[in-house]
Amino acid sequence: TKILERKWMSLTKKLSLSLFSIFFLFFITQLHSQEKFISGKAKIVDGDSIRIEKHRIRLLGIDAPEMKQLCKDKNNEDYACGHLSKNFLISFIDDVKNLKNLKEVFCYYSEFDKYNRVLGECFVGPKRIYNLNQAMVLSGHAVAYLRYSDKYLKDQEEAMIKKKGIWSGEFIFPEEWRKKNK
């Protein structure tokens, strides 16, 4: 019986340690994955960045053409796709706000990028149903930024098929353009 007791005690200790480890990992994971939010009147910086009060927010999972970037339209004519991207984001937010009589943009975040910008998913509309990140990709004014997330890849495929925005002509992916134009 003493041998059985020792085995039982050993098993109980191992089980307790395992349960404690699982609980500890779960707690740490929950602590780090808790999203925070910022809300307020947004100032549009470019097609994938906004500012709410003192917070610089980079729209997570998307990459829009840079402000100085040119793309080619379906007629092979150059156009300022970076400016067009920014203007689309401004118009989209304004249209939803005016339609629904709303004043705020809500951004959920849990991390920062190397420039100390909030990486966020931003929404407007009643019950925050209009996802700005998704709208930019679906409209063809931004691409899915796979370095951070593949969440908008299906939206990008839809924009490509429908030849929306930058997909109607030729362009260099924003990340490539930045590398070439440092």
What are these regions (language model features)?
Residues 4-6, 10, 17-21, 27-182:
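Small beta-barrel nucleic-acid-binding modules, primarily SNase/OB-fold domains
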